[in-house]
């Protein structure tokens, strides 16, 4: 389980998280929605120890992340796959080399084992036999799938997705959504997905949490969020230009 408890985080005078609390049980696909700059990416960076809270704390599998030693944090990160918004591939490396990076750093497999794991991961994202190609030869959607393959090659327990469908056309976005669902169903991973795309949120989420003014405004099932009576939540999910601030 992942648990963020009353997390506060500021950057200078800017308060980003102000009592953010969220629990993600094993097997769940939690989608975090919210306006640009609301702190969604900041929140999940606390899970892998890239940021430390000013107040509050974060637990993963019962371990308090801010208190972990460097070695313990490394071990924790080996269980967490992070899929970046823009794939974050190295252009000078082949697709196979990009996917193998984490495996080589981990040092648990020999070369044939790494090659087999890379091929397996690429097959899972429907990109077989692309190991010798380079990122510049692939479309944006294909590069995102390579980023996902790199994350799952380590066989993580958790997957964190940061805006996985940003910049993609609707058809390619639907492909990425189906892959996220596949990762949960086939690999049994617990996932947290950050997105602005409500179609994607409704497709992949088992629960959805809206981050607003530094804390969770509402968290519920897909239907509970879709039919929310909260004016702030409703304005966001329906894409309305204005809300009744008296009601908010």
What are these regions (language model features)?
Residues 213-214:
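Conserved ABC ATPase "signature" C-loop
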Residues 93-101:
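Short coil-to-helix segment of the ABC ATPase nucleotide-binding domain corresponding to the Q-loop/switch region
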Residues 48:
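Helix-to-loop junction immediately C-terminal to a conserved catalytic motif
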Residues 159-162:
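Catalytic Walker B motif of ABC-type/P-loop ATPase nucleotide-binding domains
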Residues 134-138, 142:
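Conserved ABC ATPase signature
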Residues 153-157:
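A short, proline-enriched helix->beta-strand linker immediately N-terminal to the Walker B motif
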Residues 63-64, 111-129, 181:
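Conserved ABC ATPase "signature" region
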